[in-house]
């Protein structure tokens, strides 16, 4: 049996399994760390959350988000470590 959670992402409720939740939570924690010194960090995080929500909604309403889904979206959006490489 796999644990699932209901999460609120950009005002949308999603059913997400435990592995996906941990992956997504880690990703957003790394974003918060990366943007910690930015004046508009909260807005940046909200925009990224909104994009994740859009991509998850495209998969359907009665859908459980899996780690494969979060990995796919993270790969599309990029990791904060990659942001540094792009700005170098």
Residue map of PLM features:
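Soluble N-terminal domains of membrane-associated systems
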Residues: 1-88
């Amino acid at each position: 049996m796999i644990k699932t959670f209901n999460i609120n992402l950009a005002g949308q409720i999603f059913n997400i399994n435990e592995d996906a939740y941990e992956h997504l939570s880690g990703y957003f924690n790394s974003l918060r760390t990366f943007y910690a010194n930015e004046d508009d960090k909260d807005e940046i995080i909200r925009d990224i959350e909104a994009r994740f929500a859009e991509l998850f909604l495209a998969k359907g309403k009665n859908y459980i988000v899996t780690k494969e889904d979060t990995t796919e979206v993270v790969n599309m959006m990029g990791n904060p470590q990659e942001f540094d490489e792009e700005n170098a």
